[in-house]
């Protein structure tokens, strides 16, 4: 169900992603880049685990165990294609820098002044639509389904998603009250630039939003099935 939901990415964010042809053109060099690296070294720098006997790199992504065969770099289970590409870029770029507890907006990334700041603004609008009409309990359940942990913060709810081993994403939510609608913001670790580019970071945010929406759809379908 999650994969089905991911393939139906929100129309706004669909328009921001390249077409399938561009994906295929990007996939080839991404695989070539990691093929020239030692799997042991990749694991050490990225937080993945290399099972040498099986020729498999294993990591966690949003509460899902992902196994990547080496040297083919094929994925099991099969992920949405942009999710695969981001992981390949992560494995190639990771330098082992410790995760910083300091959070930043996408606009605070190395090359984020224009692209990241725009993404922050657009994502706030998308999150406001996503949160509209949902109870705090419903939001917590959706976040938990993606493996989120909850942390203390200046927000009403702060969910920390482990998108990749050294690449957490914070979702801060302020619940609706008599004066304001519910709102949310995404944040990354100050160390994020050591693992992914600005464009990849944007793709991470888009994938996370699509996964949240997919969980919402799954819960709605389950509720309807239970009523039959």
Protein language model features and the residues they cover:
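Conserved binding-pocket/active-site segment within a compact domain
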Residues: 132-194
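Domain-length accessory/inserted modules outside core catalytic folds
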Residues: 57-58, 113, 117-128, 152-155, ...
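Short Lys/Arg-enriched alpha/beta "domain-start" segment
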Residues: 2-54, 83, 90-147
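Intrinsically disordered, low-complexity regulatory segments enriched in Ser/Thr/Pro
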Residues: 63-89, 174-199
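Acidic/proline-rich low-complexity IDRs
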Residues: 1-2, 223
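Amphipathic, interaction-prone secondary-structure segments
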Residues: 41-70, 149-175
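Alpha-helical oligomerization segments
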Residues: 177-228
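Generic detection of long, well-ordered alpha-helical segments
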Residues: 77, 132-136, 198, 202
């Amino acid at each position: 169900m999650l994969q089905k939901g991911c393939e139906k990415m929100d129309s706004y964010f669909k328009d921001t992603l390249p077409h399938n042809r561009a994906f295929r053109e990007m996939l080839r060099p991404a695989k070539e880049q990691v093929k020239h690296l030692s799997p042991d070294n990749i694991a050490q720098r990225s937080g993945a685990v290399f099972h040498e006997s099986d020729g498999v790199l294993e990591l966690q992504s949003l509460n899902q165990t992902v196994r990547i065969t080496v040297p083919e770099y094929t994925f099991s289970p099969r992920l949405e294609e942009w999710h695969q590409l981001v992981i390949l870029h992560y494995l190639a770029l990771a330098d082992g820098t410790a995760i910083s507890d300091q959070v930043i907006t996408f606009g605070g990334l190395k090359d984020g002044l224009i692209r990241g700041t725009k993404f922050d603004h657009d994502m706030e609008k998308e999150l406001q639509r996503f949160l509209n009409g949902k109870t705090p309990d419903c939001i917590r359940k959706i976040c938990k389904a993606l493996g989120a942990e909850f942390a203390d913060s200046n927000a009403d709810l702060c969910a920390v998603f482990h998108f990749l081993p050294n690449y957490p994403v914070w979702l801060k939510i302020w619940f609706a009250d008599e004066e304001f609608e519910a709102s949310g913001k995404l944040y990354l670790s100050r160390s994020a630039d050591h693992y992914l580019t600005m464009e990849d970071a944007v793709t991470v945010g888009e994938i996370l939003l699509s996964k949240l929406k997919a969980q919402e759809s799954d819960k709605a379908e389950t509720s309807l099935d239970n009523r039959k």
